[in-house]
């Protein structure tokens, strides 16, 4: 481990994180039906080569090959009981390359299920994360990164797992192009003040989701006002049509251009996510490391502090939610939207459902055409 904690280094200069592990593994002929996390045990030399490439590119921190090393994700490969072993192996491999020069960042990704009804409980998620965190700590990780999270409740479970094992952590969310997660969480709701019993993060973070241009637009006002330093790791973005060709716009030079913008608005650590690799990191490191400290002035009116209200319990959200929370039997009937503008037949069907005590009707989105009826309750 480096002599100076990561939390101290980010006060002095911008820290360079590495690129995507999965992208590099795929480019090295590891098919996507393989459990990438298991390669830390079966092919450690391959993982070390990728870490070494990022080290030579100028990264200050190496992220472990353990993103999906939790019991729920590993169950798909019949490896649910190997979460601790694979997490520890991933950290050990990264530490061998990092030595005492670089930081080892232990990657912990989501469990892949909704937290709450229909998925796993917050306690189950915390227990799964704690297993992975323990392995990463024992393998030599310096800091945990809870990355690509979409649900605040799941992030809080991850933070509690880090607290169990006294590990510093980075809390990183992923945003869609409209500025929210797939579960509708905004930046402000996701990074609302933490409960008093939880330790503060080393950094907040944004990773994956969108490319650098879109991400800058979404987070540039949050970064300078954030209560904690911010890490930014955009992905390579989506391809765009240029002269009838599909082209990925995020070249190393393009990523670096936006990395400089992120630093100018106050980001204290920069790296890459899906679609980026050592070439991107080399270009980025050469430009960003020369910037040293950057002063950021926050302009515009400041928002008054709002009282954070606890989310309502499930049974209070709606009559339907009350039935689900109570374990009552519910009935859903799907009614397909009409092909034209006449809703008479659709309303007749809905009336029949109501008369026969159907709990809820479901009007599906049309994946092959524009829907004529909104599936949202108005």
Language model region names:
Residues 1-378:
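Domain-level signal for soluble alpha/beta catalytic cores
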